[in-house]
Regions:
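Acidic, glycine/polar-enriched metal-coordinating patches/loops
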Residues: 1
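Eukaryotic scaffold repeat domains enriched in small/polar residues
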Residues: 4-13, 18-235
């Protein structure tokens, strides 16, 4: 009888410990997620091909960003299917980063020393530590709450902490409306003093102006062709 009680007590303790572990795991990510089969996880990781970076890659326009409670900053960049996330300290000095492959958009969150990468097209949430080890790969559920979190948290252009307000933005004047990414990351203290942490404004200007140039050329060719055909039909 005594052994039976000990076994029951041990089972209860294990259940409490496991429940606590599950609660902590769920608290690490704000999205509600579901587990994946190991074979599917391996396929995802093979396709993404995530690699740790020890040297800072060339800076590109900002797709997304996140700020940790200690002021550590994660900046997500990329073009086409090659993406990077670079980790900077509070002064904007590069620490380490990751490169990976994905054709769609992505968002990031930095919680303590764990980086969460959220893939929009596949609804995958990936957690990776500073050593480049994958902690988890789960699927983000399609819920109203998750959709709201995508829009208002993951892809927010402003993050506020106790000491600073971090903002990603452009400095292109009236041409800001043509930019789908961001060229500046700034932090502003409680006294209104602004510090630029990340700046690729010249790159963004070239991208936007080049796009506008090709749009104008395309429209001009279209208008000229239409005018030529109308004139020809009247002859």
């Amino acid at each position: 009888m005594k052994n039976s009680r000990n076994i029951v007590a041990l089972i209860c303790i294990l259940l409490v410990v496991i429940s606590g572990m599950i609660a902590v795991s769920a608290a690490d990510i704000a999205f509600s997620t579901e587990s994946l089969e190991q074979e599917e996880i391996e396929t995802i990781l093979s396709n993404i091909n995530i690699t740790k970076l020890s040297n800072e890659p060339s800076k590109k326009v900002i797709q997304c960003f996140s700020v940790n409670t200690d002021g550590t900053i994660a900046v997500g960049c990329g073009s086409y299917n090659k993406k990077t996330v670079c980790i900077y300290n509070s002064e904007g000095i590069f620490q380490y980063g990751y490169s990976f492959q994905t054709a769609g958009s992505f968002g990031i969150e930095l919680k303590e020393d764990i980086l969460y990468i959220y893939f929009v097209r596949s609804d995958i949430a990936l957690a990776i530590d500073p050593d480049g080890q994958i902690n988890s790969v789960t699927r983000i559920q399609n819920t109203i709450e998750n959709n709201s979190y995508w829009n208002h948290s993951v892809f927010s252009t402003k993050i506020s902490t106790e000491q600073y307000e971090y903002v990603i933005k452009n400095n292109l004047g009236i041409f800001n409306v043509f930019a789908s990414s961001y060229s500046l990351l700034t932090k502003t203290d409680v006294y209104g003093n602004e510090t630029v942490i990340y700046d690729v404004n010249n790159t963004q200007q070239f991208r936007v102006y080049s796009t506008l140039f090709f749009i104008v050329v395309f429209l001009s060719i279209g208008v000229y062709t239409l005018f030529f055909r109308l004139r020809k039909s009247r002859l």
